[in-house]
Amino acid sequence: MDGAEIARRFGLSGTARLSEGPVARGRQGVVWRLDTADGCWAVKVPFAPCTEQEMRWSTEFQEAAHRAGVPTPQPRRTSEGCVFAQIGGTQLRLYEWVDLGEPDAGLDPALVGEVVAAIHSVGGPDPRPVDPWYREPVGADRWDDLVRQLLAHGAPFADRLAELGDELVELESWLEPPALVRTCHCDLWCDNVLPTASGGVCVIDWENSGPADPSQELACVLFEYARADAGRARALVDAYRQAGGPAGVSRPGHFSMLIAQLGHITEIAATDWLQPNPRSPDRAGSAAWIGEVLDDPHTRARLLGLLDAVNAPRP
């Protein structure tokens, strides 16, 4: 890629220096660093090309969140006001550069709660349909078929997935439609809520933003940052409420987004192990990805424990 051409297309002045290669890699793309007289920028190159229309809502939502004070990198548009530029056959976009730490599910739960409340306060009613990724089950037949394929190909995690299969199916019986649909981030795992050098956090990767139930997204956050720790769960929810967050987690169905999303992540990771691809180019990476669920599963008992924790009377 040509750093000078990237700078020109995005209206950046002075000498431009592009990193020799990607400095970060995620499931959806890679990130390069661009240094210019107008500051440092993250150049994001998606694995799967997107259209301007597909990214319009999510980019506007991130821009609105940035204006409202949510700690997130500001997107940089091209000189023509576009999200993407096509340079040398490569589709890319720019964000302001932020120095970030490693993913940490042990972040201060109160800080996480405050940030999620701020995001939910930005998002308004969203008329679009909720993506099946966040609401549909994988289904017993698909789980059984996947386990059979993994066992036949000698996947090292196949037996563990088979043991968890009945639990995954029972969890899917909890699924309920979203009650209140607003624009949400939809991807607030610890990979995307990262610590900063100043002691705060920065929320990245807004590409999946879209319609969802804030209560269901809050339940995802609750599991990710509290797990089985009742004290962390209460601290997160209390901070969320005190910061004006509009949602609550009060029944098993509020874990619908978590159950659907982790189910589909598990399915995709297993499928990637069977068929490596640019998102998961090697089987070791796919095995590690599915291990994130198998090593610390979201069982009904754990989720009910979180419900009890956040709904218990406070002293």
Question: Would you name each region that the model predicts?
Answer:
Residues P214-P246, A260-P278:
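Active-site activation/catalytic loop segments of kinase-like enzymes and analogous catalytic loops
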Residues T36-R128:
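ATP-binding pocket architecture of kinase catalytic cores
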Residues A247-L258:
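All-alpha amphipathic helical-bundle segments outside canonical DNA-binding/catalytic cores
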